[in-house]
Regions:
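Hydrophobic alpha-helical membrane-embedded or membrane-associated segments
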Residues: 62, 66, 70, 74, ...
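Hydrophobic alpha-helical transmembrane segments in multi-pass integral membrane proteins
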Residues: 70-77, 134-150
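Transmembrane alpha-helical segments that serve as helix-helix packing and pore/cofactor-lining elements
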Residues: 104, 109-126, 147-153, 181
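Alpha-helical transmembrane segments of multi-pass membrane proteins
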Residues: 21-25, 98-106, 135-142, 169-176
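Short hydrophobic/aromatic segments of transmembrane alpha-helices and their interfaces
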Residues: 11-13, 88-89, 111, 130-134, ...
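Membrane-embedded transport module
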Residues: 1-115
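Membrane-interface segments at loop-to-transmembrane junctions
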Residues: 16-19, 43-63, 116-133, 153-159, ...
């Protein structure tokens, strides 16, 4: 997850399941993103102030909201599994898959803070695409292979349950796109205001 709230969302998962999310899903994506390409158009922007922290306040708020969403979505998915399908194991398995898919959405949202995840830059790093692919395949394996089911306490999911797992990730991705659209809309105005204050 992106904050303490995302960690809180794993409270209903077993320690082995939490370890799977962080070591098998989050860690590979994070490692590849740490070696990612520069943000498109970065050389056209004015330099950051020398005393500006690496994670600015706006990004901290963004991470806070993302983590809160992930925690809430995880808890909701667990409750759906318990209430609709009558099994905590189903709810935990759905939450495990949902967290894996949401981490893909988080990476797409935060990789380039203002650029759309649906642009050509998304496919510019094959290693990151492999990490995303592994997150999906790994989520499938952990619920389908008997040895992993026994190890992590998961159960097979139906097609309907997989769709429910996908919903939070899609919503998170679309919310990120909406936020980026607002930032891109405001950026020309900010540049114009900055240019107006610069003496000729």
């Amino acid at each position: 997850g992106s904050s303490a709230f995302a960690i809180a969302g794993t409270a209903l998962l077993s320690p082995a399941q939490v370890l799977w999310v962080h070591m098998a899903i989050v860690a590979p994506i994070g490692a590849v993103m740490g070696l990612d390409l520069a943000t498109p158009g970065i050389m056209d922007r004015k330099p950051r102030p020398f005393n500006q922290p690496i994670i600015v306040r706006s990004m901290m708020v963004r991470l806070f909201v993302v983590g809160l969403f992930m925690a809430a979505a995880t808890l909701v998915v667990v409750q759906i599994g318990k209430g609709t399908y009558g099994s905590l194991e189903v709810g935990q398995t759905m939450a495990l898959v949902g967290l894996g898919l949401m981490n893909i959405a988080v990476a797409l949202n935060l990789r380039f803070p203002e650029e759309s995840a649906f642009g050509p830059s998304t496919v510019s790093n094959p290693k990151l695409l492999w990490a995303f692919g592994w997150a999906v395949v790994g989520s499938m394996l952990i619920v389908q292979l008997r040895v992993l089911q026994d190890l992590f306490g998961t159960v097979p999911l139906s097609g309907e349950q997989w769709l429910i797992c996908l919903v939070p990730a899609v919503v998170l991705l679309l919310l990120g796109e909406l936020f980026k659209l607002v930032l891109r809309t405001r950026r020309p105005k900010a540049h114009a205001a900055h240019a107006a204050t610069v003496p000729a």
